[in-house]
């Protein structure tokens, strides 16, 4: 599939025209393993609004024509929820010194083409522009034997 994806970095409020598309994208991607999350457009719009209302927040969008196929977010850690900040505080980190990379979500057909790398590059550039020296993110970890984990079968002679 030829890729003609545009990467667009927007300040928080500038992403608001995309909120419905971003909400649906988050619901679609987060429904799958490892997230296993079932959200609603209403909740997602409220969640996205927290980024739009936060000074220093960034949305990095991946657009295939007019279709939003991916997004990534970031904000100063000091603006994050206590739930997100608490592990960093417990480890001795000052939230004022950290830029937090929120989610990166990308439709499956667009994975493996360097878009995720661009998400990191754009957020790092934004954090550096704001004067941050440190960036961080959180990840979902599931057990290796989780029943929803896809099993990758090794290629064997039977496949030849």
Pin down the residues of each PLM region:
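Conserved acetyl-CoA-binding loop-helix of GNAT-fold acetyltransferases
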Residues: 103-106, 112-129
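Conserved GNAT acetyl-CoA-binding A-motif
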Residues: 98-101, 127-150
